[in-house]
Amino acid sequence: MRVVFMGTPDIAATCFKRIIADGFEIVGCYTQPDRPKGRGMKMVYSPVKEVAIANNIPVFQPENFRSDEVVEELRALKPDICAVVAYGRILPQRVLDIPTCGCINIHASLLPQYRGSAPYQWAVLDGLKETGVSAQHMVLEMDAGDVIDVEKTPIGENDTAGEVLDRLAVLGAELLSRVLTRAKNGDKCCGTPQCKEDVTFAPMLDKSMCPIDWTKTACQVHNQVRGLHPWPVATMELQGKKFKVHATRVVEGSGEPGEILGLTKTGLKIACGEGAVEVIQLQAEGGKRMAAPDYFRGHP
């Protein structure tokens, strides 16, 4: 079975490594074009491209699939199936129609929940206790395909989005390998249509979401800090200074929203609209990440 892999970030690289290790015949890899990064604006390969190069797999990096030339380049690979994980590119219908067995996507949510670009982050922001990954048959509508199979994982009360993603990457790799094995053995991998009444969306995160609103409940503030970590990171202002807030926990306490209730051995206690949170780790603008008590001992 001839497989073309499409993906870009770390979660995709984890899945890519797994199906390479499992011995699938991968005839090509599609990933986003190299991008300039860092102070020197040096061109950087995507994690998926790094894996492809290390395993001598041909790499293709089109900006899009609008041109006939790009589409025919994919067709020439004669894929039986395309495995797509966080590619970051829209696939038009004429691309979806190329593989004889279709395109299979691994999405980082339990579909139909959280269709869109930031599924696991919104699961944490919304305070969910469980999330997972879904394997779906790709259709033109975003994340709307029939669901073939899922893997689930709990979300701990202090888990960050980044920590959840690490687990989802491993689960996604297992799920992709399992579905490809079924397809290789002749299974059509029929899926279940998504219930339209249960559809929710996970729009892209942006920095406008970062400032903490202390009138919210302690749980909501804590979920904001967890869901926006490691990017774009929640922020607060204190004594005229701006801080990134890397870690909090919900604690007992009451006061006016935003009122400083005290500095403990483990953090800075701040009142919310309901309850309080303890800021455990923060980062002053231009500074490094520190335990809150350590920072305030040096900045009384």
Regions found by a protein language model. Give the residues of each.
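An anion-binding loop in the catalytic cleft
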Residues: 215-300
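Donor/substrate-binding cores of folate-linked one-carbon enzymes
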Residues: 21-22, 32, 81-201
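Conserved beta-strand segments of alpha/beta enzyme cores
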Residues: 25, 56-58, 102
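A residue-level signal for conserved active-site and pocket-lining positions in enzyme catalytic cores
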Residues: 7, 29, 52, 82, ...
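N-terminal glycine-/serine-/threonine-rich beta1-alpha1-beta2 phosphate-ribose binding loop
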Residues: 36-78
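Acyl-group handling in specialized metabolite and lipid biosynthesis
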Residues: 203-216
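Short beta->alpha connector loops
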Residues: 9-11, 63-66, 87-90, 251
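N-terminal Rossmann-like dinucleotide-binding module
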Residues: 1-42
